[in-house]
Each structure stands twice: as structure tokens, then as C-alpha cells.
């Protein structure tokens, strides 16, 4: 069974404290905007690794593709959307 965007959002929220999260997708390919203080001081690859860690095995088994925009709260407030 393919996950819904709401389920992917919940999976990420369970493993990563998010200030804001939006997820869209078709059940196989998803796009996410994730705003988290956990991203402070981290580069893009490290931020994506945090999200992949939050998804765990689901990333391999349920989510086939995830395009992410990962921002700190300051970046989001500054308009880096």
C-alpha cells in the first residue's frame, strides 16, 4: 500500500522536531518543505540525512522518491522558500 502525503508528514514528524512541514505527492513521489531548528549549522546533505533517518526503513520500502527543501526557522522567516 502506498503512503499518502499525510502519512509521510507524520512519519517525518515522529522522528524530527519540525517547526513547519508540508508534504505533497502521488503515493510514490513526494515533495516536502521541512522547517526545523535541528537543521541549524548543517549543510544540505546533513539536513537530508536527518530526514532520511526520521523516515528509516520507510524510505526504502514505501517512499520511492522524496524531493526536499530543508530550512531553518530563520531561513524560512527570511523568505528562502
Which residue ranges define each predicted feature?
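A short interface-forming secondary-structure element
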Residues: 33-46
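N-terminal first-folded block
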Residues: 1-28
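C-terminal structural segments of small proteins and small subunits
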Residues: 52-81
